[in-house]
C-alpha cells in the first residue's frame, strides 16, 4: 500500500520523516542502505509502528534482512549456559527483531491476519523454548534432574492457554501459562530438590526471564493466574495433582480456558497426552447446555468491568468485540464437542468452519463472524504495533487515529469507524441471540401452580386437559415430585425443573396421546435427573421440548431409547435432522471412522452411540412420514452392515496382535434374512454365517502365539460375535443368530469355503436355498466375498423340478405357519400370517429357484422390491402386477414398522389397505399354483 504524501497531515508527515531519518542515522558507515522500493516501504512501516522504527534504529543490521522481497523468520538466539547474564538481552533483542519482521510483513500486505497471529505465537513459543532449555541446563548443573520413583527423568511441561494455545496470539499480548510435570520425585544433584520445588523454581525463573523489564524492554508478559487455585495455588503441579483439582474443583470458566490449551514448551508430548485425559472435563460426553451458565457469568463480569472502566471503545472486551466471537464459538463447542470430535478445535476460525459444517451456525452467520473476527484482529494488531502496547482501546489522540486509519487503508478515522460499526453490531446480535432468554410456549399458570404444590397438588387441576385418566396421571406426577431424584436436586437444577415442568405438562396434555405422553415423559426425566445438562437442554431449547413430547407420545420405542440413552436428545436439536438422511456411503464412513480409536471398549461405545443416533434419525423420519418404511428398513440394513464391517476390523486387529495372521487367508461374513434382504427392522437381530479360506500349505497363523488356521478363524468369528453383543454404556450393538449356518446349531461356528460349497451342493434343503436367495456378503475380504457370490450363483442356478420345488416350498410354509403364525380370528400376524410378508418372500424365492437356471440375472438382486421387478421383467409374474405387489409390500412393512415404533406386537386387526395387500400376495401365489394355507380368515381373502 502506497501512501501519497499529500494524504498525510503535516504533523504525520513530519513524524514519518523524523523516524526514517533516525533509522538512516543509525546505519554504520560500512552498511549500505537498501535501494529500490525500500524507502517507500519503510515510510509505510513508520506510519504504522513507532516500535518497529525504534527497533530498526537500535538494530540497523535488520534492514538488509527486511529488504528481502519475502523476509523469512530470523534465526533463534543461542543462549550460552555459561553466560546467563546475557540471556535477557538476547531474548529481548530477538523478540524485538522478529516482531519488527512481523510488522513489516503485515503492513506491506505480505501476510494475512491468520499468518500474523501464527507468527506472533511461534515467536512466543521460540522464546519460551530457548529460555526453558537454557534454564534446564542450568538447573541440571545445580540440582541434577528430577527422577521419578520408576526411574524416569521428569521435565517441566509448559501449557499455553488462551490465544497462545489457539495459535492466535496478538502482536503485544501477554501469555497465559500453566506449569505441570508428569510425576513427583527428587532431583539427583548435589543440591537435591523435591519435584514440586524444583519445577516451581524453574517455572518462576522462566517467567522472570521472559517478563522482567530491562534496558532492552521485555520478551513476553507472563500471566500465571489461570493455574489451579489461581494465585493461591502452587506454581507447578504434578499431573496427578492437576487431575485431582479438575475432578473436585474445576469450574465452568476453566473449561473455556482449557479448551484452547496446548503444550508449548518442555515435555510437549507428555503434556499433549495429559490434555487428552482432561478432555472429559472440557468436553462433556453428553450435550451440555450448562456451558451457557458459565458463559453468562463471565459475560456479566466482563460487562460490569467494561462499564466500570468506560471501555465501550475496547474492541476486545466491549460490545461486539473479539471476546464475544470467541465466547460464542467456544460455548457451542463446549455444548456439543463431547459428541462431535470435529468441534474440538483450538483455533477460532477453524472452529467457526466446523460449527457451520455441523449445522450449529448457518453459512451466512458463519461468514459474517469470520469477516468480523479478521477485521477486529487486524485492527487490534495495528493498535498494538503502534507502540508495542497491550491495548485494545481505540485511540483518542487525533494523530494516532490518523495513523491507524491510513495504515488500514481508510482515508480518515470516521470512515474506519463506519466500517467497524456494522462488524461489531453483527457480532453483538449473534452473541445476544445465543444468550437470549428462550421463548417458550406459554403454559397455563394453573399448571405451574399445580406442579409447585406437588406432591400435595390437586388432581382436579388436570381435569379437562385431554387425559382419560387424570387421577392416574396425578399420582404419577406426585410420585415423581416426591422422588429422591427430584428432592436431591441442587437449587439451580430445581429452578430449571420448575421452569421446564409446566411447559412439558402443557405439551403432554396437548399431544396426540396424552395418557401415553405423561408417563413416558416422567420416565425420561427420572432417568436424566442426575445429569442436569439435560434439564439445561430443555430449558435452553424450547423447540426441543416440544419436539420431545411429540415423539414421546407417538413412539414407545423411542421413549424407551431416550430414557435409556439421553444422548439421543441431541438428535431432536440437530438442524440436519429434517434434511436428507445419510446415504449408504455416509453411514459406512461414520462407522469406519472409529477404527482410529485405540481402545476397543471406547471404540465399541462410540460405534454404538453412532448407531443409536443414526437409527434414531431413521426412526424419526419414519415417524414423521418423511420417508417410506421400505426405505427405512433398507437404511437400517446399510447401518448394520457398516457396523459389522467396523466390528470385523476391530476383531481382526485384536486377533492379529495376539496370534498373527493366517498368511493368504480370507474371511467373510454373510448376511441372511432381513439383513441380507435389506429389510431390517428396529431392534432386529442379525442372521450371520461365517466363512473362511486359506491356502492348503498354510496351516497356522504367524504370530508369537500361533493358532491352527481353522481355529484362528473360529476365534475371529467368536470375537466378532462377542463385540457385537458386548454391553457398553450405550447398550449392545446387535443380537446375533447363527442358526442358518450349514447343519445349523450342531455345526461348527465357521465353515470353510470348500465345506460350504459342498454342503450347498449335496446336503442343503430347499428351504436353505430359499434363504440363500436373500443372502449376501456384508463384510470381509473381497476375494472370499466374490467366491461366496459364485457359490450362491452356482447353487441357485441348479435345474429344479418345478412340481417338487413348489411342494417343498408349500410344506415349509405350512410348517412355519403352524409354528410361528400368531394370528387369531380378529388379528393378523403381519409377518407370518396368511397373505403376510413371509408369503410374499416365499413366492419370490420359488420364482428365483425355479427360473434362475434360464434367467441368471435374477441372482443379481436379493431384496424384495428388486426381486419383484426382476421376476416381472422375465414374465414369471404378470406384467401388470409390479405396482400392486410393491404397494402390498410397502403397506405391510409400514404397518409392521409402526407397530415396532410403538412397542406393539406385529399383530393387528386388518384394515382395508392390509386386506388389499394380502389379496394381492394371495393372488400372486395362486397364479404360480403356490396354494399356501389361508388361515382363519380365508373368506376375507
Swiss-Prot record:
Listed Pfam families: GlnD_UR_UTase, GlnE
Reaction catalyzed: [glutamine synthetase]-O(4)-(5'-adenylyl)-L-tyrosine + phosphate = [glutamine synthetase]-L-tyrosine + ADP; [glutamine synthetase]-L-tyrosine + ATP = [glutamine synthetase]-O(4)-(5'-adenylyl)-L-tyrosine + diphosphate
EC numbers on record: 2.7.7.89, 2.7.7.42
One Gene Ontology term from the biological process aspect of the record: regulation of glutamine family amino acid metabolic process
Alphabetized UniProt keyword annotations: ATP-binding, Magnesium, Multifunctional enzyme, Nucleotide-binding, Nucleotidyltransferase, Transferase
Keyword Transferase attributed: yes
Cofactor or coenzyme needed: Mg(2+)
InterPro entries xref list: GlnE, GlnE_rpt_dom, NT_sf, PII_UdlTrfase/GS_AdlTrfase
Residue ranges of the region described as Adenylyl removase: 1-437
Enzyme class: transferase
GO MF entries: [glutamate-ammonia-ligase] adenylyltransferase activity; [glutamine synthetase]-adenylyl-L-tyrosine phosphorylase activity; ATP binding; magnesium ion binding
Family membership: Belongs to the GlnE family.
The protein's name in its UniProt record: Bifunctional glutamine synthetase adenylyltransferase/adenylyl-removing enzyme
Species the sequence originates in: Xanthomonas oryzae pv. oryzae (strain MAFF 311018)
Amino acid at each position: 500500500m502506497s501512501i501519497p504524501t499529500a494524504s498525510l497531515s503535516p504533523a504525520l508527515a513530519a513524524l514519518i520523516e523524523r523516524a526514517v531519518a533516525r533509522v538512516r542515522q543509525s546505519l554504520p558507515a560500512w552498511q549500505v542502505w537498501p535501494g529500490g522500493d525500500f524507502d517507500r516501504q519503510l515510510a509505510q512501516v513508520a506510519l504504522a509502528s513507532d516500535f518497529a522504527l525504534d527497533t530498526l534504529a537500535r538494530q540497523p543490521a535488520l534492514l538488509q534482512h527486511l529488504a528481502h522481497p519475502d523476509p523469512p523468520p530470523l534465526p533463534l538466539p543461542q543462549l550460552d549456559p555459561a553466560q546467563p547474564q546475557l540471556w535477557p538481552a538476547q531474548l529481548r533483542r530477538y523478540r524485538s527483531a522478529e516482531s519488527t519482521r512481523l510488522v513489516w510483513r503485515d503492513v506491506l500486505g505480505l501476510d494475512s491476519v491468520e499468518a500474523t497471529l501464527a507468527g506472533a505465537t511461534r515467536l512466543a513459543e521460540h522464546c519460551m523454548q530457548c529460555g526453558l532449555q537454557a534454564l534446564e541446563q542450568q538447573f541440571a548443573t545445580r540440582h541434577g534432574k528430577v527422577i521419578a520413583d520408576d526411574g524416569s527423568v521428569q521435565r517441566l511441561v509448559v501449557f499455553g492457554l488462551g490465544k497462545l494455545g489457539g495459535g492466535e496470539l496478538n502482536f503485544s499480548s501477554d501469555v497465559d501459562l500453566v506449569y505441570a510435570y508428569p510425576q513427583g520425585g527428587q532431583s539427583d544433584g548435589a543440591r537435591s530438590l523435591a519435584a514440586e520445588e524444583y519445577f516451581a523454581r524453574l517455572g518462576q525463573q522462566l517467567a522472570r526471564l521472559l517478563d522482567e523489564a530491562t534496558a532492552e524492554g521485555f520478551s513476553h508478559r507472563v500471566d500465571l493466574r489461570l493455574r489451579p487455585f489461581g494465585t493461591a495455588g502452587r506454581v507447578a503441579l504434578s499431573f496427578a495433582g492437576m487431575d485431582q483439582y479438575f475432578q473436585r474443583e474445576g469450574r465452568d470458566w476453566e473449561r473455556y480456558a482449557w479448551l484452547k490449551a496446548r503444550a508449548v514448551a518442555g515435555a510437549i508430548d507428555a503434556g499433549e497426552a495429559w490434555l487428552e485425559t482432561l478432555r472429559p472435563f472440557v468436553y462433556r460426553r453428553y450435550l451440555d447446555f450448562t456451558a451457557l451458565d458459565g458463559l453468562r457469568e463471565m459475560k456479566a463480569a466482563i460487562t460490569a468491568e467494561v462499564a466500570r472502566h468506560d471501555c465501550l471503545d475496547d474492541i476486545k472486551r466491549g460490545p461486539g468485540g473479539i471476546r464475544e466471537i470467541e465466547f460464542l464459538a467456544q460455548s457451542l463447542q463446549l455444548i456439543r464437542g463431547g459428541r462431535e470430535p470435529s468441534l474440538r478445535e483450538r483455533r477460532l476460525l477453524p472452529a467457526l468452519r466446523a460449527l457451520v459444517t455441523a449445522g450449529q451456525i448457518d453459512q451466512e452467520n458463519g461468514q459474517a463472524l469470520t469477516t468480523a473476527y479478521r477485521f477486529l484482529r487486524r485492527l487490534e494488531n495495528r493498535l498494538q504495533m503502534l507502540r508495542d502496547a497491550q491495548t485494545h482501546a481505540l485511540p483518542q489522540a487525533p494523530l494516532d487515529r490518523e495513523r491507524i486509519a491510513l495504515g488500514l487503508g481508510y482515508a480518515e478515522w470516521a470512515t474506519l469507524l463506519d466500517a467497524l460499526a456494522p462488524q461489531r453490531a453483527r457480532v453483538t446480535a449473534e452473541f445476544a441471540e445465543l444468550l437470549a432468554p428462550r421463548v417458550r410456549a406459554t403454559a397455563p399458570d394453573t399448571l405451574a401452580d399445580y406442579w409447585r404444590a406437588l406432591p400435595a397438588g390437586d388432581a382436579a387441576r388436570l381435569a379437562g386437559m385431554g387425559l382419560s385418566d387424570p387421577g392416574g396421571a396425578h399420582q404419577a406426577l406426585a410420585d415423581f415430585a416426591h422422588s429422591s431424584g427430584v428432592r436431591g436436586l441442587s437449587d439451580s437444577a430445581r429452578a430449571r425443573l420448575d421452569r421446564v415442568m409446566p411447559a412439558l405438562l402443557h405439551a403432554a396434555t396437548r399431544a396426540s396421546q396424552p395418557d401415553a405422553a405423561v408417563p413416558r415423559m416422567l420416565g425420561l426425566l427420572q432417568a436424566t435427573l442426575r445429569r442436569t445438562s439435560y434439564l439445561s437442554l430443555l430449558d435452553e431449547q424450547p423447540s426441543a421440548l416440544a419436539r420431545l413430547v411429540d415423539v414421546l407420545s407417538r413412539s414407545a420405542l423411542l421413549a424407551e431409547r431416550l430414557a435409556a440413552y439421553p444422548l439421543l436428545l441431541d438428535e431432536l436439536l440437530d438442524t440436519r435432522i429434517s434434511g436428507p438422511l445419510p446415504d449408504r456411503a455416509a453411514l459406512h464412513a461414520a462407522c469406519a471412522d472409529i477404527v482410529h480409536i485405540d481402545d476397543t471398549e471406547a471404540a465399541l461405545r462410540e460405534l454404538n452411540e453412532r448407531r443409536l443416533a443414526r437409527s434414531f434419525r431413521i426412526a424419526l423420519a419414519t415417524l414423521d412420514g418423511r420417508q417410506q418404511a421400505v426405505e427405512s428398513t433398507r437404511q437400517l440394513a446399510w447401518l448394520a452392515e457398516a457396523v459389522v464391517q467396523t466390528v470385523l476390523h476391530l476383531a481382526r486387529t485384536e486377533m492379529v496382535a495376539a496370534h498373527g495372521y493366517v498368511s493368504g487367508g480370507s474371511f467373510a461374513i454373510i448376511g441372511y434374512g432381513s439383513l441380507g434382504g435389506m429389510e431390517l427392522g428396529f431392534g432386529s437381530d442379525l442372521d450371520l454365517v461365517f466363512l473362511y479360506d486359506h491356502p492348503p500349505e498354510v496351516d497356522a497363523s504367524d504370530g508369537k502365539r500361533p493358532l491352527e488356521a481353522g481355529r484362528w478363524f473360529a476365534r475371529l468369528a467368536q470375537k466378532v460375535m462377542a463385540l457385537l453383543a458386548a454391553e457398553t454404556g450405550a447398550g449392545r450393538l446387535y443380537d446375533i443368530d447363527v442358526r442358518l449356518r450349514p447343519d445349523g446349531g450342531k455345526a461348527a461356528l465357521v465353515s470353510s469355503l470348500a465345506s460350504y460349497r459342498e454342503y450347498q451342493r449335496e446336503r442343503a434343503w430347499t428351504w436353505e436355498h430359499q434363504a440363500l436367495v436373500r443372502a449376501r456378503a456384508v463384510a470381509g475380504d473381497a476375494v472370499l466375498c466374490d467366491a461366496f457370490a459364485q457359490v450362491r450363483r452356482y447353487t441357485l442356478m441348479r435345474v429344479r423340478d418345478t412340481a417338487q420345488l413348489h411342494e417343498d416350498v408349500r410344506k415349509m410354509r405350512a410348517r412355519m405357519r403352524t409354528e410361528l403364525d400368531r394370528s387369531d380370528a380378529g388379528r393378523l400376524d403381519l409377518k407370518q400370517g396368511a397373505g403376510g410378508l413371509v408369503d410374499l418372500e416365499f413366492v419370490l424365492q420359488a420364482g428365483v429357484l425355479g427360473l434362475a437356471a434360464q434367467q441368471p440375472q435374477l441372482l443379481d438382486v436379493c431384496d424384495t422390491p428388486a426381486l419383484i421387478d426382476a421376476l416381472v421383467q422375465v414374465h414369471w409374474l404378470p406384467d401388470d402386477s409390479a405396482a400392486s405387489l410393491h404397494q402390498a409390500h410397502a403397506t405391510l412393512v409400514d404397518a409392521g414398522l409402526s407397530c415396532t415404533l410403538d412397542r406393539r406386537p406385529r399383530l393387528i386387526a386388518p384394515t382395508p389397505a392390509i386386506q388389499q395387500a394380502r389379496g394381492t400376495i394371495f393372488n400372486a401365489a395362486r397364479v404360480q399354483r403356490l396354494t399356501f394355507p389361508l388361515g382363519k380368515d380365508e373368506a376375507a381373502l
